[in-house]
């Protein structure tokens, strides 16, 4: 998917990009490739692949969820900024917080935000388990996103504590998501969530499977969650 195809594909979904936004994506791609030579940000560096598997894939959530109704977003373990920064470029009103445990990624994200002229973006170098117990952030976000490889039960413990009551947790998964969801149902309920919607679709060009789950927070997460760093991964609630 080249930049022109990317622009057309988004327009077909009702997302019209301005010249400024197109340049932001171009600069994002260039910086990602440039910085990737000195630090491991992504295995995907071909332009068409980046536009499809990073940019388009990140924004695909907006085909099913109305981002205009959200104000604050927290992205847990965003790595090189996915999915939250492509979404932010498309919806500039959003106030985005990214938490990641790797300091070098923070350095990249700081430089990227400055280069792209992004405002209302904040980057936090922290473990998600510690961040989720921080009163300044706990149960403060309209939407929390995760596009991570961790199991859904683990992601729920890391992300649900950050979602405000009435807010949403948006999980982006590739294949075999239904099986993961079944295993995670106990955890989702324990942390105050209820699975509201599931959208299954294929990424264009390569036709790979994608799943988006919207989990609504119906009650507060018990204070003891998330547990200490490493525990959710070692002893997932399933």
Curated annotation (Swiss-Prot):
Q: Name one GO molecular function term.
A: rRNA (guanine-N7-)-methyltransferase activity
- EC top class named in words: transferase
Q: Does the keyword tRNA processing apply?
A: no
Q: Quote the Gene3D superfamilies the UniProt record gives.
A: Vaccinia Virus protein VP39
Give a GO cellular-component term: cytosol
Record's subcellular location: Cytoplasm
Superkingdom of this protein's organism: Bacteria
Instruction: List its EC numbers.
Output: 2.1.1.-
The positions annotated for binding S-adenosyl-L-methionine are 77, 82, 128-129, 147
Q: Which InterPro entries match?
A: rRNA_ssu_MeTfrase_G (IPR003682), SAM-dependent_MTases_sf (IPR029063)
Against Pfam families, the record matches this protein to: GidB
Sorted alphabetically, the keyword list is: Cytoplasm, Methyltransferase, rRNA processing, S-adenosyl-L-methionine, Transferase
Q: Give the protein's biological function.
A: Specifically methylates the N7 position of guanine in position 535 of 16S rRNA.
Q: Which family does it belong to?
A: Belongs to the methyltransferase superfamily. RNA methyltransferase RsmG family.
Q: What is this protein called?
A: Ribosomal RNA small subunit methyltransferase G
This chain is encoded by the gene named rsmG
